[in-house]
Regions:
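Conserved polymerase palm-domain catalytic core
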Residues: 126-127, 132-135, 139-332, 338-341, ...
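Glycine-rich, often proline-containing surface loops adjacent to acidic residues and nearby aromatics
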Residues: 93-94, 151-153, 304-313, 418, ...
Length: 464
C-alpha cells in the first residue's frame, strides 16, 4: 500500500500533462492511510466538532470504523447522508445556509478533496485566489495592487447565487475531461445529490454545492477555472500596443531639452553655459511633474483580472465601451458555458476614480507622484496612477456584527445600527473584558493595515 504522499505526488506529476486522463482513482479510497491523513487534516478545524445530521462528531475515531467505511466504498453501497442545514446570520437579519456533512461524509470528502487538489491545483490560473494553498484574500489584494495600476475602468463581477446554482451536469462534464473513472465520478455525483436537512425535512438539491461541504471549495474552483481560462484567452486578444505613446507634455519638454543640449555643445562662454544648465535642470524638474505616457492612447489597451471564489474584479485600460463589452461577453460566457448568471445589480462598470467593492475593500486608482530614473539617470514620472485600498464602513460594521457587539433594526425602511451587549463576557472582570475587545480590534487592524489606513471614524474602537 503506497503512502499518501507518494500517491498524491504521482497524481500531481501526471497532472502536468494536460492531455493525461486519470483512471483508477476510486481505488485510492481503499487506502486506509489516506483516511488517517484526512482525519488529521479535519480533526482540529473549527466546526468539525459540530454534529452532522447523524448526530455524530469527528472524535472517537477508530480503525474498525474506517475499515467499515472502506467496505461500503468497495461495493458502492456507501450513500452520503443529507447535510444538516445550519443558518449563519447576516447583517441584514437574513441568514446564509451552510451544509454540515455527517462525520463519515466529512472524512470521505477530505480524501476526495486531496485527490482533486493533486490533479487540478497545478493547472489553476494565478488569477484565482480563493480556497487554494498559500493563497488568500491578501494575495488577491496584493495582485490587484501590483497589476491594476493605470486602470481606467472596473468591472465588478458577482455571480448570482453561485454555490446554489452550480449545474451538476456541467460540473460532471468538466470533471470527465480529466477523469476517466466512472466509480469516482459516481461518488462525486452522490455528494452533489445528497441534499440537505432543514428543520429535519429532507430536500433534494438539483444544483449547487453545500457551502459547508469540504469538497465545495475545490469543486467551485474546478468549475470557475473555465472562466479564468476564458478570460486569459480574452486578455490575449484584447491587449494591444507595447507601451503608451509619449504624452504631449513629455514631448514638449523633451524637445525643449534637445534644443538646450544642442546650444550647450556650441556655447563656450562659461556664464552662458551655467545659465543653460540651470534651464536644463528646470526642464527636467518640470518634466517629472507629468506622466511620461499618454493617458488615453487608442493604440494601447490592457485588461487585468482577479478572482476570489465567486467574486471577481476586472481592470481595464481602455474606453467605457470596452468595459461594457467585456462585461457583456463575460455574462454570455457564464450563461452559455457554465449555466450561471451575473447579478445585474452587483456587476457594475465603474470608473476607477470611484470605489469598486472587492473582498470588503473599496478600491480606486488615483494619481501618483511616484518618480523613477531612466537608464540615463534622468527623473521620470511613472504613468502616474496607483491602486488605493480602503476598508469600507460596511466591512467594519460586518465585523462588529460578527463579534456580536452591534445589531441592526429597521425603522421606516431605514437601517439603524445600535451597540449590543456582549453577554458572554458579563461574568468576566474589567481587565478580561478589555483584553477580549482589544484582541479583536488589534486582529482586525493588523489584517487591514497591510494595505491601507483606517480613518478615525471607521475604526472598530470608534464604533464600539
Amino acid at each position: 500500500m503506497r503512502s499518501p504522499e507518494r500517491v498524491l505526488n504521482s497524481l500531481s506529476e501526471h497532472s502536468k500533462d494536460v492531455s493525461y486522463k486519470f483512471e483508477r482513482l476510486y481505488r485510492i479510497l481503499f487506502n486506509e492511510e489516506m483516511f488517517y491523513v484526512a482525519y488529521q487534516h479535519i480533526y482540529a478545524k473549527e466546526g468539525n466538532m459540530t454534529k452532522g445530521s447523524d448526530g455524530q462528531t469527528i472524535d472517537n475515531m477508530s480503525l474498525k470504523r474506517i475499515e467499515k467505511l472502506i467496505d461500503t466504498l468497495k461495493d458502492e453501497t456507501y450513500q452520503p447522508q443529507p447535510s444538516k442545514r445550519v443558518y449563519i446570520p447576516k447583517k441584514n437579519g437574513k441568514k446564509r445556509p451552510l451544509g454540515v456533512p455527517t462525520f463519515n461524509d466529512k472524512l470521505i470528502q477530505e480524501v476526495v478533496r486531496m485527490v482533486l487538489e493533486a490533479i487540478y491545483e497545478g493547472n489553476f490560473e494565478y488569477t484565482s485566489h480563493g480556497f487554494r494553498p498559500n493563497r488568500s484574500c491578501h494575495t488577491a489584494l496584493t495582485h490587484i495592487q501590483k497589476e491594476f495600476s493605470g486602470a481606467k475602468w472596473f468591472v465588478e463581477g458577482d455571480i448570482k447565487g453561485f454555490f446554489d446554482n452550480i449545474s451538476h451536469d456541467v460540473l460532471i462534464n468538466i470533471l470527465k475531461e480529466r477523469i476517466a473513472d466512472e466509480r469516482f465520478i459516481r461518488l462525486v455525483r452522490k455528494f452533489l445529490k445528497a441534499g440537505y436537512i432543514e428543520e429535519w425535512q429532507f430536500h433534494n438539491t438539483y444544483s449547487g454545492t453545500p457551502q459547508g461541504g469540504i469538497i465545495s471549495p475545490i469543486l467551485a474552483n474546478i468549475y470557475l477555472d473555465k472562466l479564468d481560462k476564458y478570460i486569459k484567452e480574452y486578455i490575449a486578444k484584447f491587449d494591444k500596443g507595447k507601451k503608451r505613446k509619449f504624452s504631449r507634455e513629455s514631448l514638449d519638454f523633451g524637445n525643449a531639452r534637445k534644443r538646450i543640449v544642442r546650444r550647450l555643445k556650441s556655447v563656450k562662454d562659461e556664464r552662458q553655459r551655467v545659465k543653460l544648465i540651470l534651464e536644463l535642470k528646470a526642464i527636467e524638474q518640470g518634466r517629472a511633474k507629468y506622466p511620461n505616457g499618454e493617458e488615453m492612447d487608442a493604440d494601447y489597451r490592457r485588461m487585468k483580472y482577479a478572482r476570489y471564489a465567486d467574486d471577481f474584479l476586472v481592470g481595464i485600460i481602455g474606453s467605457k465601451q470596452d468595459a461594457q463589452q467585456i462585461k457583456g461577453d463575460i455574462k454570455n460566457f457564464l450563461a452559455d458555458k457554465l449555466a450561471l448568471e451575473l447579478s445585474d445589480e452587483k456587476t457594475l462598470v465603474t470608473h476607477t476614480e470611484r470605489p469598486a467593492k472587492f473582498l470588503g475593500y473599496e478600491i480606486t486608482v488615483r494619481k501618483s507622484n511616484d518618480q523613477r530614473r531612466d537608464k540615463r539617470g534622468r527623473l521620470r514620472r511613472t504613468y502616474g496612477k496607483r491602486v488605493c485600498l480602503n476598508v469600507s464602513m460596511e466591512t467594519v460594521r460586518k465585523k462588529l456584527f460578527d463579534w456580536g457587539v452591534l445589531e441592526m433594526t429597521n425603522r421606516n425602511g431605514k437601517e439603524i445600527w445600535k451597540p449590543k451587549c456582549k453577554s458572554g463576557l458579563i461574568f468576566n472582570d474589567d481587565l478580561e473584558i478589555l483584553d477580549s475587545y482589544n484582541r479583536e480590534i488589534v486582529g482586525f487592524y493588523n489584517y487591514s493595515v497591510s494595505y491601507t489606513h483606517l480613518r478615525a471614524h471607521e475604526t472598530p474602537e470608534h464604533l464600539v
